Amino acid sequence: MTPMTPSMGLTSVSADPSTTLLNLLTELKPLGPIRAILVMPGASAILESVVDSSQWTLNEKRMPSGKTLLTAALPDKSFEFHLDTAVATQATLGISAKTQGPVVRVLTSDGAGLLTLLPSKEKAAEFDAMLEEKGGVDPLRGDIVLDLVPTPDE
């Protein structure tokens, strides 16, 4: 994996810079184990865990409140997180300046971090292929930026 210079701003080089959160997490499942870092917006709390993402069950569910939550959970429920798909509106994919490994950040519309996923460095070639499929990271312009759109109703 080639180290990249982190961008000062978010710029996409992808031809189709959108996907659903469900599709993105589905693509990341085989790249584990993944370190998941969940940020609590507005609170001084961060939760980190390393998880075998290949075992994730991914599910979207409309709640009685009208919100749609995406859940990633292990079968034994020892690991589980929920994201409001209306709040998680953007994702960046690139190479971490800190770890020099793969990094995916799920962001709010104002750019605040909700979730950071660090796929396994042993799966760097697979992550690089995923980046290339999405247009590749431009070392001068930074990470790939994806708009996260709602999953179409079936």
Residue positions per predicted region:
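Eukaryotic intrinsically disordered, low-complexity regulatory linkers and tails enriched in Ser/Thr/Pro
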Residues: 1-154
